[in-house]
Swiss-Prot record:
This is 6-aminohexanoate-cyclic-dimer hydrolase. The active site is at 72 (charge relay system), 150 (charge relay system), 174 (acyl-ester intermediate). SUPFAM superfamilies: Amidase signature (AS) enzymes (SSF75304). Transmembrane segments: none annotated. GO terms for biological process: nylon catabolic process. Pathway: Xenobiotic degradation; nylon-6 oligomer degradation. Keywords: Hydrolase, Nylon degradation, Plasmid. It comes from Pseudomonas sp. (strain NK87). PANTHER family: GLUTAMYL-TRNA(GLN) AMIDOTRANSFERASE SUBUNIT A, MITOCHONDRIAL, TRANSAMIDASE. Its EC number is 3.5.2.12. Catalyzes the hydrolysis of 6-aminohexanoic acid cyclic dimer (1,8-diazacyclotetradecane-2,9-dione) to form the linear dimer 6-aminohexanoyl-6-aminohexanoic acid. The gene is nylA. Homodimer. The keyword Plastid does not apply. It catalyses: 1,8-diazacyclotetradecane-2,9-dione + H2O = N-(6-aminohexanoyl)-6-aminohexanoate.
Amino acid sequence: MSKVDLWQDATAQAELVRSGEISRTELLEATIAHVQAVNPEINAVIIPLFEKARRESELASGPFAGVPYLLKDLTVVSQGDINTSSIKGMKESGYRADHDAYFVQRMRAAGFVLLGKVNTPEMGTQVTTEPEAWGATRNPWNLGRSVGGSSGGSGAAVAAALSPVAHGNDAAGSVRIPASVCGVVGLKPTRGRISPGPLVTDSDNVAGAAHEGLFARSVRDIAALLDVVSGHRPGDTFCAPTASRPYAQGISENPGSLRVGVLTHNPVGDFALDPECAAAARGAAAALAALGHDVNDAYPEALGDRSFLKDYLTICDVAIAREIERNGELIGRPLTEDDVEWTSWEMVKRADQVTGRAFAACVDELRYYAGKVERWWEAGWDLLILPTVTRQTPEIGELMLAKGTDLEGRHTALISGSLRMLAFTVPFNVSGQPAISLPIGMSSDGMPIGVQIVAAYGREDLLLQVAAQLEGALPWVARRPQLLNPSRKIPAA
């Protein structure tokens, strides 16, 4: 019997099962053993579903029959399983979801087996994953560093080979930021590409800024996953343009010479871009130029304007207030100040001051900003390449605000922290465009640095083709985190 290396991607694992080289039971048990050995050190999987996975593995059919995956404990739910959104009161209630999200249904139909649920900051409101409800998730590359957020559990889990792929969602960079600092591939698709439904706690997907996303260690896995989970479902607020063919079918094709803009400085000027982050983006740009693309220093002028953040943050306040309200409805009692973290309750208090007319004005401003961003692509550019984050990976605890911090002045307060994590990601949540973070760079202290590529609305096909080109030109698969060094082998089935 052949042994499986759990560092192999989902496509390779599925082929081993399909060919009979390994059984789905052997694959699952090896994965469970690895999670049990490694997860106590990083705290990525907070709700293990091993017995459920064993039952589902026996019944799994489809192209990925028996391959495990992990689900972020936020918005997208799985029937019968604990659902908390990392809210203390929800965790204490023991609430279990009464349905499967469309995402979960589609993953099961493709044969994927749900292994567990992974950590997130409370309701996804932080760019580091350190909720009071479950504790901090630690970076497999350095246990003293953050995994980013809000899909930090997903990024850490895929980086540590706890599963080959994972679900995430992204309202300001919450897939791309963890992908960058954990050294994996993270895709935020076009708005409406993946259904978040049937929603139970969110309000209009944060005015369209929140998108379901995907984590993997290879571009081909991202393409295959997107084929599995894409598509409009009843009740979805937004709908992405239909792809002309499966993404996995087209990623190996040469897209021809494309016009690619590069941004390696902060156009707002309120902080300096970390030189190693800038260097990683320049390295990727040079690789694209060597592949025949027309690469130039160019970017949307709108990226030099961050005034939209005030309106965006107001919308976030209202979305969180509504999420707290609806979670209370799920457990049969209102959630109170004692049930949530102090920052979440401050958001509720601010949301209570927002009128309907003021909220509508904020949405209008985001739509206006989105148009300004998108017009750059309309002018003939195909892709934008830039750092995913603009700073080095923070330490655990560095980004958590002390209780009592004046959140009214949070734009200024976040300049040295959270804003530097999301400054280059949140504009594309507002515009709804597809964006991917690739683990191209490494810092001088051994931490991954992601490079972000952004395509025009609906053009994941082009995005993935170029991502695959970069994966071939600047391969990252041989780099493994310190947690998985040779002295500590990944269990084989």
